[in-house]
UniProtKB/Swiss-Prot annotation:
Keyword Cytoplasm: yes
InterPro entries found in the cross-reference section: Alpha/beta_knot_MTases, tRNA_m1G_MeTrfase_C_sf, tRNA_m1G_MeTrfase_TrmD, tRNA_m1G_MTases_N, tRNA_MeTrfase_TRMD/TRM10
Chief subcellular location: cytoplasm
Catalysis performed (reactions): guanosine(37) in tRNA + S-adenosyl-L-methionine = N(1)-methylguanosine(37) in tRNA + S-adenosyl-L-homocysteine + H(+)
Enzyme nomenclature, EC number: 2.1.1.228
Organism: Clavibacter sepedonicus (Clavibacter michiganensis subsp. sepedonicus)
The name this protein goes by in its record: tRNA (guanine-N(1)-)-methyltransferase
Single annotated GO MF: tRNA (guanine(37)-N1)-methyltransferase activity
GO-annotated cellular components: cytosol
Family designation: Belongs to the RNA methyltransferase TrmD family.
Binding site for S-adenosyl-L-methionine: 111, 135-140
Subcellular location(s) of the protein: Cytoplasm
Assigned keywords, A-Z: Cytoplasm, Methyltransferase, S-adenosyl-L-methionine, Transferase, tRNA processing
UniProt function note: Specifically methylates guanosine-37 in various tRNAs.
C-alpha cells in the first residue's frame, strides 16, 4: 500500500518509523511518502495561510500550495482515495479502516488553522476519490493526530503487517462488539484471580465466556453498537 501525507509538520510522522508500521515500511508492505506543504510555496516567508473571505476568526490555508502538493501526489495517476480529516466529515470506524486497507493508494491532507480552502477539496474531487473523515465530535489543532490514528488503524489491517492475523479477529469492533477482557500470568495477583474458566482448558466454555463478556461490556459501555 502507498500512503501519501501532505502536512506543514512532516516530522510529526517520524513515529511511523518504529513498531509494526516501521517494519512494514522496511519490508515494503507500506510505501510512505511525506510531502511538506511549505515546499510548494514561492515566497520568502513560505506562507500557507491567509485571512478568510467574509471575515471571522483564524486563518484559512491557501489553495495554491495545496494545489501543487496534490499535483505531485496525483502525478502517477493511481486513482487514490484522498482523505481530508474534518469535524464535518463521516465518522471513522473499524469498518471504514477495513474498507480502506484494501486500497492500493491512500493520500491524506492535514489541515491546520480554520481549515483548507474549500476549493482544494472540490478540485481534488474532480481528480480523485475524496472523503472527509472525522475521528469524533471534537476539534483538534490540526489533522496530523487524526491522520496518525487512521494510518495506525488502516495499516495494521494490511495483510502481512500484523504477524498473527487471528489477533485482528478478536479485537474490539472487529465483529461489531467491544473486546473481551484479557489475562496472563500469574494466575493470582494482589488478591485478584484469573477467571477459572480461562484456566480450564475447555475451549467451548472459554469461547462462550468471552462472547458473554463482549456482550456485557458492549451493553454497559457502548449500547449504541448493539442492534435494536
Amino acid at each position: 500500500m502507498r500512503i501519501d501525507i501532505v502536512s506543514i509538520f512532516p516530522e510529526f510522522f517520524g513515529v511511523l518509523d518504529i513498531s509494526l508500521l516501521g517494519r512494514a515500511r522496511q519490508s515494503g508492505l507500506i510505501d510512505l511518502r511525506l510531502h511538506d506543504l511549505r515546499a510548494f510555496t514561492h515566497d520568502r516567508h513560505r506562507t500557507v495561510d491567509d485571512t478568510p473571505y467574509g471575515g471571522g476568526a483564524g486563518m484559512v490555508m491557501r489553495p495554491e500550495p495545496w494545489g501543487e502538493a496534490m499535483d505531485e501526489v496525483l502525478a502517477d495517476d493511481t486513482d487514490p482515495v484522498v482523505i481530508f480529516p474534518s469535524p464535518a466529515g463521516e465518522v471513522f470506524t473499524q469498518a471504514m479502516a477495513q474498507e480502506l486497507s484494501a486500497e492500493p493508494h491512500l493520500a491524506f491532507g492535514c489541515g491546520r488553522y480554520e481549515g483548507i480552502d474549500q476549493r482544494v477539496v472540490d478540485h481534488t474531487a474532480t481528480r480523485a476519490r475524496v472523503r472527509l473523515v472525522s475521528l469524533g465530535d471534537y476539534v483538534l489543532n490540526g489533522g496530523e493526530v487524526a491522520v496518525m490514528a487512521m494510518i495506525e488503524a488502516i495499516g495494521r489491517l494490511v495483510p502481512g503487517v500484523v504477524g498473527n492475523p487471528a489477533s485482528l479477529v478478536e479485537e474490539s469492533h472487529s465483529d461489531g462488539l467491544l473486546e473481551h477482557p484479557s489475562y496472563t500470568k500469574p494466575p493470582e495477583w494482589r488478591g485478584l484471580a484469573v477467571p477459572d474458566v480461562l484456566r480450564s482448558g475447555n475451549h467451548g466454555a472459554i469461547a462462550a465466556w468471552r462472547r458473554e463478556q463482549q456482550l456485557e461490556r458492549t451493553r454497559r459501555v457502548r449500547p449504541d453498537l448493539l442492534p435494536d
